[in-house]
Regions:
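Divalent metal-binding pocket/active-site signature
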Residues: 62-66, 79-86, 91-92
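Active-site beta-loop-alpha junctions enriched in small/polar residues
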Residues: 23-25, 49-51, 87-91, 113-117, ...
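Active-site beta->alpha loop and helix N-cap motifs at the rims of alpha/beta catalytic domains
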Residues: 1-63
Length: 179
């Protein structure tokens, strides 16, 4: 983003916290983006969980505890005074392993979960995939049981705050994440 555009965030920050979601393919990219934007945000969410990212991005990172640890550690080493939230993928055998790696690297909180998948949708009129990327994340009410399972298991495994997301449509859905 351009410096002028980033400065506009300060007006927003007077009214509400701004959390920047960062996406990349290496420690350097995540750290560079964080360094360039740290003065304009209240927290960073490191998105290491997008299921439809091209190879080397998103869940390709978040499925690997070592890569997750290295990226979180790199950003945390460069950005000392801005909280780091790591958004986790549910598409792993043991989400607590990834959560612990992020916590050990210095994450201040975790977001659970990103979309599930990838999945595929076909446009019946054209007989072609709906997404240009062909595959994409599956979201909506049907992922809530998966999100709840991930939050439940992770809550028992780490000592940092959790943001439970995924499949929430009503206040009753949100309340389930609190229990």
């Amino acid at each position: 983003a351009k410096k002028e555009e980033l400065k506009d965030l300060n007006e927003i920050r007077d009214k509400t916290p701004v959390i920047a979601s960062i996406y990349g393919d290496s420690e350097e990219v995540f750290s560079d983006v964080a360094n360039q934007t740290k003065d304009y945000v209240d927290a960073f969410e490191l998105n290491v969980s997008c299921p439809h990212a091209k190879c080397g991005f998103g869940s390709n990172i978040g499925e690997n505890p070592e890569l997750t640890h290295d990226i979180v550690s790199s950003v945390k080493d460069n950005i000392k005074d801005v909280p780091i939230i790591v958004k986790l993928t549910p598409n792993v055998t043991d989400i607590t392993e990834i959560a612990k790696a992020a916590e050990d690297a210095g994450a201040d909180a975790l977001t659970l979960i990103n979309s599930v998948g990838p999945g595929l949708r076909i446009d019946y009129k054209t007989a072609r995939p709906i997404l240009n990327n062909v595959f994409g994340g599956i979201a909506g009410p049907m992922i809530k049981p998966i999100a709840l399972k991930c939050v439940y298991k992770t809550y028992e495994a780490v000592d940092i705050p959790l943001f439970g997301v995924g499949g929430i449509r009503t206040y009753k859905d949100a309340l389930e994440f609190l229990y």
